[in-house]
Amino acid sequence: MDFDLMVLRKRLANRGFQAFVCSDIKEAIDLITKSLLNKNDSVVGIGNSMSIRELELTNFLSSKTVYERNLTGSNEDERKALHADIYFTSANAISYDGQIINIDGTGNRVAATCFGPKHVVFVIGKNKIAESLEKAIERVQNTAVLMNLQSIT
């Protein structure tokens, strides 16, 4: 199904999110590094996410303190990421009406998005959009969980 990303953007805005639509990875990196990442954001948290890894975001953060468990394997870094100035993560799925669905093995990403840094940036690819909440949950159960298992084994 082909989704109108501007409609989804408006629906996210109606839920209190500021959403941006990028045409490719380069545009997403430019948006993050030139607009979203404030010069005062000295501490950056990164949730374990294949979408974030695809951006190779850590390559653009050399002047920042970065807490990402993938870099160190440290649970302590997961805790420190909760207090970052800005936190980057992805979602397992998003419904076309703007509901973000995340199921998390250890809870670090969900905790950070709900109770952590003041600024949270979700990087969500078109492949994660589902036509309804039910289809989004189905995507999580049948696709995202399996992909996450493959990425950690």
What function would you assign to each model-found segment?
Residues 2-88:
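N-terminal active-site beta-alpha-beta segment that forms phosphate/nucleotide-binding
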Residues 82-153:
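Conserved phosphate- and dinucleotide-binding cores of soluble alpha/beta proteins
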